[in-house]
């Protein structure tokens, strides 16, 4: 199967980049289109966290407005940071149109869902539990994450957006 060959080839290339002395390797994620095979970059990142030793693992980035569970995202990324012993750089994106259609997300709420998910994830990494969360788009009766990032207070985060002035200013 061609996909199996490609995924393993890409992972080998990331390992080779570390051997060549690169400081970081970047993974991208897109959904429902043919121009990016990386549809679950957190899985790839967790593999790289284990098979590399030094290189930063840079995620460009998780599409926060289309994820359904920011608590799960916080735990996944904290786990990657733990396995890598602090080499995760978490990037957040609002997601392109294809991500919204693919994930049944309403584009009218894109920005506010992005901001709410981002703020929730940072809280999940830094706020002692248990606590309750009642946001506009996400609701949790009981938040008590025990999987916390290796890096304190949390991994470096960034937003690689360039399309809207609001995102750049945010």
Language model features by range: what are they?
Residues 1-3, 66-133:
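Flexible, glycine-rich active-site loops centered on histidine and acidic residues
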Residues 1-59, 152-155:
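N-terminal beta1-alpha1-beta2 module of alpha/beta enzyme domains
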Residues 1-2, 97, 139-154:
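N-terminal small/glycine-rich loop or linker at the start of catalytic domains
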Residues 5-16, 73-76, 162-170:
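Short, acidic/polar
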Residues 33-36, 64-68:
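Short, small-residue-enriched loops and turns at beta-alpha junctions
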Residues 47-48, 79-82, 170:
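Hydrophobic/aromatic ligand-binding patch that stacks against planar heteroaromatic rings
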Residues 113-125, 140-143, 160, 170:
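Extended catalytic-interface subdomain
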């Amino acid at each position: 199967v061609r996909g199996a060959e490609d995924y393993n080839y890409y992972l080998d290339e990331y390992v080779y980049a570390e051997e060549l002395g690169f400081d970081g390797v970047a993974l991208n994620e897109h959904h429902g289109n043919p121009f990016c095979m990386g549809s679950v970059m957190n899985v790839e990142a967790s593999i790289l966290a284990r098979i590399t030793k030094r290189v930063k693992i840079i995620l460009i980035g998780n599409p926060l407005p289309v994820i359904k569970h920011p608590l799960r995202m916080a735990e996944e990324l904290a786990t990657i940071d733990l396995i890598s012993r602090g080499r995760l750089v978490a990037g957040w994106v609002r997601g392109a149109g294809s991500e919204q259609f693919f994930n049944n997300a309403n584009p009218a709420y894109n920005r506010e869902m992005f901001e709410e998910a981002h703020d929730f994830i940072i809280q999940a990494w830094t706020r002692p539990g248990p606590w309750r969360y009642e946001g506009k788009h996400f609701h949790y009766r009981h938040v008590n994450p025990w999987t916390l990032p290796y890096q304190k207070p949390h991994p470096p985060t960034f937003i690689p957006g360039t399309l809207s002035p609001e995102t750049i200013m945010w």
